[in-house]
Amino acid sequence: MSRISSLQDPFLNALRKEKVSVSVYLVNGIKLQGQVEAFDQFCIVLRNTVNQMVYKHAISTIVPAKSVRMIYNSFNPYHQNSNDEQDENVDDIHSDDLEIQENEGNIHE
């Protein structure tokens, strides 16, 4: 079954590929830190001293240690961008750099 690519997939994939350190805040207030090792539709594998599988429904917020710029129009047809200005202090992530999986069951590694 194919699906419209969400904002989650390109964002998490950029964090994974760039090995960006992240702080993951859970809905119960716990803060986890590490790097996104892999992810699928339901969970994220977070690597620090050990690997942790975190279910997405338990996540409140993901905060990257550095800025990640996404080109939303390439991934989300519902996003309307009024201007295409680039912020030179933000990393550019281009659609051809991202591996978007059409199959919901695939894990990105």
Swiss-Prot record:
Coiled-coil portions: none
Pfam families: Hfq (PF17209)
Family matches, as NCBIfam families: Hfq (TIGR02383), PRK00395.1 (NF001602)
One GO CC annotation: cytosol
Region annotation Disordered: where it falls in the sequence: 77-109
Recorded name of the encoding gene: hfq
Naturally occurring in which organism (per UniProt): Francisella tularensis subsp. tularensis (strain SCHU S4 / Schu 4)
Homology family: Belongs to the Hfq family.
GO molecular function list: RNA binding
Domain of life: Bacteria
Subunit structure: Homohexamer.
Domain annotation Sm: ranges: 9-68
Keyword rRNA processing: no
CDD domains in alphabetical order: Hfq (cd01716)
Keyword RNA-binding carried by entry: yes
Name of this chain's protein: RNA-binding protein Hfq
